[in-house]
Amino acid sequence: MREFVVVGRPNSGKTLFTLNFAAYMGSKTVDVISRSYDNLVSCRHFSITEAKNQLCGMTLHKTPFVQSLVLKIPLGKIDVNFKITDTCGIGEHIHPNETIRRGMAQTLSFLRSADYIFHILDVSGITTEHLEKQTSIDFDIYNYGIVHNRYTLLANKIDLPSTKEKIPKLAYLFPKANTIPVSALLSQGFKEVKLCVAHNL
Amino acid sequence: MSYIEPQNIILAIEKGDIPPSQALRYFQEMDFKIRTNSQVNHSQKRTEDILHELDHLIGLSDVKKIVREIYAFIEIQHRREKEHLHTEPLVLHMIFKGNPGTGKTTVARILSKFFREIGILSRGHLIEVERADLVGEYIGHTAQKTREQVKKASGGILFIDEAYSLARGGEKDFGKEAIDLLVKAMEDHKNEFILILAGYQKEMEGFLETNPGLNSRFPIHIDFPDYSTQELLTIAQQMLTARQYSISIDTTATLLTLLAAHQNTVHENFGNARTVRNIIEKAIRRQAVRLMAKGSTTKEELLFIEGVDFVEVK
């Protein structure tokens, strides 16, 4: 089964994207398989609304370790299963909390082994510093993904008015990336993401 | 600090020794090294395997020498390009001259694989055509057929056997049109395919003399000399070994006499390695008939071709 890993900074909307994308693909309920950093696997069954209430939030590092969903996509006359894995957000600096550091290490481990990378970028977080120094972790993820040729940038939070003027700058910041503007909250741009999944299965 | 294994990087993040951004850069370097090394090693190994396959062919020392020269030339052109020096254009259209069964098609097949490995050809396939595949029957038909073959050969080698037959029909024949189209295609698509014209020595020389424009467009001319009797014997032994058969010393002498007789008596139509293959296959069938008469056979009997099996082979 092909595995698509969703990575990005903390609070960029990875979990909300994963759950709303599952809903867009026709799932009413989801089995969330979590794998802790010591390889303890647990499975929880949720409705999409319950999952969003429990797993998403405004606090940083709400997702401390990877959690996967198995979804179906119709290809021709058959349905093909694929795995989408939501990860712990990664930042530029060494985190003081060991649990979070382990979560980040697990994210990078999955990033290396995944078949495809969906990099969620919080467009509202693009600042002048980004434009000048390009020091954000997002550039490191981008550089890693581009080299591996199995990467798509999902420019998230396009529903916010402040992001409108920033979208055109993405072509300058991430020139080689295949970019899809999305709103994880409003499920916008998911048709293109679905096409991307179908294309890379 | 340098990290050798990806697991060490993961541990370093967990311990708080390096930030995730640094880890990603380490991973990138690590993956790049692994990929580059494996690509270079695989490509080099495949190129060596192909050259080994060529070296394994009996005789053809001139052919082997020219292929090595081409390899060295291409390699040096690449190195010059890296140093921003002037490079010679790589025109690799060839003429193969030799009697039937001297290995022209076999060498062309090996060359197609070789050129793909060293990056000259994108697909490295061989399209083998003759007059009938290129020359049409009515006006406009030849252009259509020739263009189709050139298109098919894109990324590979277009091998025209008995190429002189294109000029066989004289001025009014459509063969001349095919030649003109091929010359144009060689110029227009020079980086996309390699054209090899093959045929008997004498006829090819006559063909090139009557079409002086052609000669200058083929920088590489390779002669395929007839095999000596000893070389033919080695080829026969190779063929027998490949089919899990064997011959005794006495039978070897019989086979040698048979090959020499073939070379002396029917020289004009002698098919060299192809004739050897036919002789071997006939002998194998004769052996089968001989053994069928016996009720039971030993492993040794099944393995050995006797002198008597070669006697009746013509």
Cite the ranges covered by each PLM segment.
Chain A
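Short, conserved loop/helix-junction motifs that constitute active-site signature segments
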Residues: 142-148, 174
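Conserved alpha-helical scaffold flanking the Walker A/P-loop in AAA+ ATPase domains
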Residues: 68-72, 105-110
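Generic enzyme active-site microenvironment
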Residues: 84, 120, 154
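Amphipathic coiled-coil/heptad-repeat helices and related helical stalk/stem segments
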Residues: 100-104, 137-138, 166
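Conserved Switch II/interswitch segment of TRAFAC-class P-loop GTPases
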Residues: 89-97, 111-135, 158-163
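Loop/turn-to-beta-strand initiation segments
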Residues: 79-83, 115-116, 150-151
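Conserved G1/Walker A P-loop phosphate-binding module
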Residues: 1-92
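Canonical P-loop GTPase G-domain recognition
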Residues: 152, 157-201
